[in-house]
Each structure stands twice: as C-alpha cells, then as structure tokens.
Amino acid sequence: MPAPVGRRSPPSPRSSMAAVALRDSAQGMTFEDVAIYFSQEEWELLDESQRFLYCDVMLENFAHVTSLGYCHGMENEAIASEQSVSIQVRTSKGNTPTQKTHLSEIKMCVPVLKDILPAAEHQTTSPVQKSYLGSTSMRGFCFSADLHQHQKHYNEEEPWKRKVDEATFVTGCRFHVLNYFTCGEAFPAPTDLLQHEATPSGEEPHSSSSKHIQAFFNAKSYYKWGEYRKASSHKHTLVQHQSVCSEGGLYECSKCEKAFTCKNTLVQHQQIHTGQKMFECSECEESFSKKCHLILHKIIHTGERPYECSDREKAFIHKSEFIHHQRRHTGGVRHECGECRKTFSYKSNLIEHQRVHTGERPYECGECGKSFRQSSSLFRHQRVHSGERPYQCCECGKSFRQIFNLIRHRRVHTGEMPYQCSDCGKSFSCKSELIQHQRIHSGERPYECRECGKSFRQFSNLIRHRSIHTGDRPYECSECEKSFSRKFILIQHQRVHTGERPYECSECGKSFTRKSDLIQHRRIHTGTRPYECSECGKSFRQRSGLIQHRRLHTGERPYECSECGKSFSQSASLIQHQRVHTGERPYECSECGKSFSQSSSLIQHQRGHTGERPYECSQCGKPFTHKSDLIQHQRVHTGERPYECSECGKSFSRKSNLIRHRRVHTEERP
C-alpha cells in the first residue's frame, strides 16, 4: 500500500516477525519477544486486510509460544508474587521450566481492540469490565492480569484476585477474539468463558487449550464476529446460556432457512413466523417480541425524552438520535456523496442515500414484489398486508401502522400546532405541512414533470399529473370497466354502483361518497368561504370556484372546442358544449324516456313528474321548480331591476323582457 506523502509507512507484520526470529533464542522467548506494536498513526495507515493479517500473526505467535510447553494432559505450575504475575511452562511432566512469560507485559494496543474487535468499542462501564477494558482510562488489555494491575491505580477492588494458572493465561488471551468467533457471548470472568465453551461439547473445563487456539483458524471463523453479542454480568446467565450454544455449529430456521450462531437468537427470530409477542405493555396492552421494543414503546405513554441537547434545548427519545443530532453541532466526521455532495454523519446513511442515485432497491416485499431502499420501509410496508396497526390512540382508540402518524394524530385531541410559518403566522400540526405551505410564499415548485416541464409544490400532484402523459390507468372498475390512474379514485367511483355514502353531515344528515364533498358541504352551515378573490374580494367555498372566477378578470378561456373553436373558462362547459356537435344526450328520464345533454336539465325535468318545488320564497311562501325562477320572483318584492336598456335607460327585472324591449329601438320583428 503506498504511503501518503510526509508520513512513514508502517512496518509489515510479516517483516516484523522475521526480524524477531533473528534474536537469540537461547535466552528464552517471551510473548513480548514476538509481539508487534503499531502507533496510532501507523495503525490508521493499514487497510482492512492488513489489520486482519496483523491479528493472524499475533495469534499465530501466541500459539507458537504456548505450544512449546503446553498440550492436553500436561501439568502446569503458576508462580505469583505481589510484584508480578508470571507463568512457568514445562516441556514435559516433571521437567524444569524452559521459559517464563510475564503476563503483565503482554498487552494489545488500543487500535486493535477498537478496529479488530469492534464489539468491545472500548466501553467504559463498571470496574469489573466483562471485556477486560480498564474503566478509568482508555488503555486496552488482552489479559485479566494486565487489567488487575492497571486497576490497582484506580480501584482497590480486585474481584477475582488469585493465582493465574495456564488456563487463565490461554482464556484471557482468547477472550477478546474467540468469543466473537463462536457464539458471540461475553462473560464477566475468564473461568466463566472457559466453562461455557467446554460444557456444550461435554468436555471438562481446562481440558484442551490447543483446540481453542486452533479455533482461531478453523473454517474461516476468524471473520465471523458473531450474530448475537450478549453481555452478561452474572454467572446465572452463563448457566442459562450453556444449553443453547453450539461450538462451531449453526441453528437454522425451519421456516425460512435463515441460520444463526446462537439458539436464543433463533428463538427470537422464530417469533416473526409464529407471531408470538411475549412482552406486553401495561398501559395499552400492546405486545412486542423483544423487551427492548417494549421499553422504547413505554416512552410514548410517559412522554419522556431523556436525551436533551444543551445547545438547542432539543430532546430525544433514543440515544442514537441524540448522538446523531450532536454531530451537527460538533462538526464531526462527515461522509460526502460523490454525486450531489450531500454529507451525512453516518456512513450507513450515505449508503442508503446513494441508492437514490443508483436506483437500487434491495429490500423486496414477498407478498406484492414491491421493493424499497431501506429495510425499515419494507418493514412498515409489510403491515399493509398483515393489517397490523400497533400504534393506538388512547383517546379515541384509532390505530396506526407508523408511530409518527400516531404522534401527529394526537395533536387533533390536544390542539397542538407546533410548526408555525414565519411569514404569515399560520401554524400546523405536521412539519411536512409547514414545508408545503411555505412554498406558497417562496413560489418554490421542486417537483417538475420531465415530459412537459410543468412543476408542482407537492410530489403527489406530480404523480397524478404524470398519468396524463403515460395514459396509465391500472385500476379498472369491475362493474362498468371504467379505469382510473389512482386506487382511491376507483374506490370513490365504486360507491356510485354500491350507493355507499359513508360521509354524513352531523347538521342536516346529508351523506356523501367523498370526504372532500362533506368538508365543502359543511361550509354551507358554517358560512365559511376560505377562498377569496384578490381583485374584487368575492369569496368562495371551493378553491375550484375561485379559479373559475378569476378567469372573469383575466379573460382566460383555456378550454377550446376542436370543432368550432369556441372557448370556455370551465372544462365542464366545454364538455356540455361538445354534445351540441355529437348530439349526445346521456341523461334519460326514466318516466317518459326524454333525454338531455346536462344532468341539471334532467333533474329539473323530473320535477315536472314528481311535482317537487324545492325553492320557496321567504316573503310570500310561493314555491318554484327552478332556482332561477325563485331569483326572478324575489325581484317583485325587492323591486330590483338589474337589466337596463342602453338606449333609453329603462330597466327590467328579467333579461327576456330587456331583449323584447330592445326591438322597439331596432324595429326588429321576431
């Protein structure tokens, strides 16, 4: 690997070992003689493969040192003193010692623990650290003896102060690495680990250390850190765990054939197939498959946000979110996207983001084949098929598939509107609604159609618009074979056939097929007219009414007839006009068979059969079939004459009377 300019290249692990071999072996070899050390700067220059090689070499050297006097059935003697802890290794039973290895000298540098053994993470917890890391300083140790000597400077307690025999020597070295290669478990003391590893296979503890050393290189287990790294601080956990771990074996799920290194991980996984949820919330009776999920869920009820940012006074439920947020303030390591230069605090977030550019969607739904960029998105999507709605509102009982939907829904009950527009002061319950609203002020339309260049403020509007170009209408009605571009429009249409009107007005009892129609109808009772014309101040109950009205001021007539060139301000007016050319009369009276080009004409006609006169004068009580007739009649009471002759100034209450009067001036004869 080429060295960066101005920095020295680290020595190769193999070359360092070769140099060690030249030393005088007659003086006796210690582990320190074959140990290889790197500084922090040198360690950072090594790539991943070189770091793995380093660990291989260190383990190989250790195997050579211990094999000189250690094998199955041999006796070992330990000599311990207050000044140092050492081991004498005999070549055979009864022979004199050939070498002395000082455990206090044998240690692995900090970068190794951090990079090669990522699960340890150099955590600083209690003085009795289950991964043999000093709790007060950041120095790392490979053996328990090193840790005890180091802790004497900071802590008077020595939880397992005893003579260190050869098995402890072997187990202590193995602890950091080997427990990640087998089942992934960690235990508070070396003896616990040795007992744990021996029990599943039926062998006695301390019976064979050479087999454990060989496990480093067997079946490439070195590269398998373990799938379930459980940290146990009590011996009873070891006893429980002994019955579920297999040395070198895998536990396979009979449903999906996924394999696990530990049986309790398999048991936990199988709850996905069985649907079993052992941990139940005492507040809402919702159950979970994992205890950690229950603990996180309970925070929803308490409203607790234990992780608070001191700079911005923002609080978080999860520690990971808090750490992620803090990186924005501290300006920590940022991972940059090569395509758009966007930066991220975590490399995993960058990898997920890059799928936007590559189009990769590695997570596919087994039910419908839909794929996603993130596993969490797939997990949420699968609830559509299962019908699971785990997040329930304690006020009204309504349930949701996603927790943020529940949080947003709760604001309906509390009336909370935490997101306020800085331009107009309008507030919103959701941040996404505020962002969309702010585009009205900024004029931003970030979603542009590639076909025609038309842009939109909302992504949903762009998707709806695209169907105009593609002509894609995948949702077809089974009754009339009419097709639609969106599923919810089909559902609304099907209510025409079923007669279903699920949205009912609480004031007058009138029901509607669409919720939007009910909202618009309610404005009749409340008198709300939220859409106001900036030109004349006239207001409307519907946005479409305002758009159509504005065309009176602008003179815009965007809808043109292809037959005669006549243009209209409304699409409905064009459709009605085109029936003049086609002769189409789709609205037929069931009583007499007469047909009409407009539905309003049919409704008015049917009142002739039924005798219905729904429009009544408030002054005299006279009823009328048509609303226009009522308006004309009311002018008798008000004296209003809106139609004035431009020639003589005479005015009339009806337009037809004005037309007839004009013929007096023009001398036109009908």
From Swiss-Prot:
Example of a GO MF term: zinc ion binding
Predominant location category: nucleus
Keywords: DNA-binding, Isopeptide bond, Metal-binding, Nucleus, Phosphoprotein, Repeat, Transcription, Transcription regulation, Ubl conjugation, Zinc, Zinc-finger
N-terminal signal peptide: none
Keyword set includes Mitochondrion: no
Tagged with keyword Phosphoprotein: yes
Family named by the database record: Belongs to the krueppel C2H2-type zinc-finger protein family.
Protein name in UniProt: Zinc finger protein 551
Species this protein is from: Homo sapiens
Name of the gene: ZNF551
